[in-house]
């Protein structure tokens, strides 16, 4: 005998699976409320969802916010989730690259201030547009500040100079 009960539910999702998917949509909606307006404009969203995301910031009471985010989750069902995830992943990737580059420049600054001429030569080889005289002067001021336990204003100038060189070399300026 064929069990018709099992055959009836083969293609359907369980109640738990549906709840998980709805919860994931609400979490994605929460994430979209934290995205900047220019990034939000790049996402393929309906006008109704854009309006609901803008209103989400106005709800501060826990219950009201939770209700509104459930509404946002409901609106998210009709969206192209793959396209939204792709844009958000691209943003996360560029953010990680920016942070990695930023930390690399901080390491260069610290090596130049704490280091010797070899570090300066390596830096000049990596960034050929460097004005050695200006960079040496900035490093010398930063070393004096560090020796006298003063606030690191000159170290910030070294970092700014290094960052400007990096942006120039990458064509960002």
Curated annotation (Swiss-Prot):
Keyword Nucleus tagged: no
NCBIfam families: PRK05255.1-1 (NF003593)
Protein name (record): Dual-action ribosomal maturation protein DarP
Function: Member of a network of 50S ribosomal subunit biogenesis factors which assembles along the 30S-50S interface, preventing incorrect 23S rRNA structures from forming. Promotes peptidyl transferase center (PTC) maturation.
GO MF annotation terms: ribosome binding; rRNA binding
GO biological process: assembly of large subunit precursor of preribosome
Organism classification: Bacteria, Pseudomonadati, Pseudomonadota, Gammaproteobacteria, Pseudomonadales
Family: Belongs to the DarP family.
Cellular component annotations (GO), alphabetically ordered: cytosol
Coiled coil: none
Encoding gene per record: darP
Subcellular location: Cytoplasm
Entries under InterPro entries matching the protein: DarP (IPR006839), DarP_sf (IPR023153)
Segments passing through the bilayer: none
Superkingdom, taxonomy of origin: Bacteria
């Amino acid at each position: 005998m064929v069990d018709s009960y099992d055959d009836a539910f083969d293609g359907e999702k369980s109640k738990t699976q549906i709840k998980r998917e709805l919860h994931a949509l609400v979490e994605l909606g929460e994430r979209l409320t934290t995205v900047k307006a220019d990034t939000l404009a790049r996402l393929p969203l309906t006008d109704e969802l854009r309006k609901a995301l803008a209103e989400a910031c106005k709800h501060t009471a826990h219950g009201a916010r939770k209700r509104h985010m459930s509404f946002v989750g409901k609106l998210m069902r009709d969206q192209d989730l793959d396209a939204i995830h792709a844009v958000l992943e691209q943003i996360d990737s560029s953010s990680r690259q920016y942070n990695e580059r930023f930390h690399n420049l901080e390491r260069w600054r610290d090596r130049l201030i704490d280091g010797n001429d070899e570090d300066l030569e390596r830096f000049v080889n990596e960034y050929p547009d460097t004005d050695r005289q200006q960079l040496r002067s900035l490093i010398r001021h930063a070393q004096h500040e560090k020796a006298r336990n003063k606030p690191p204003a000159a170290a910030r100038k070294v970092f700014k100079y290094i960052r400007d060189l990096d942006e120039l070399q990458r064509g960002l300026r």
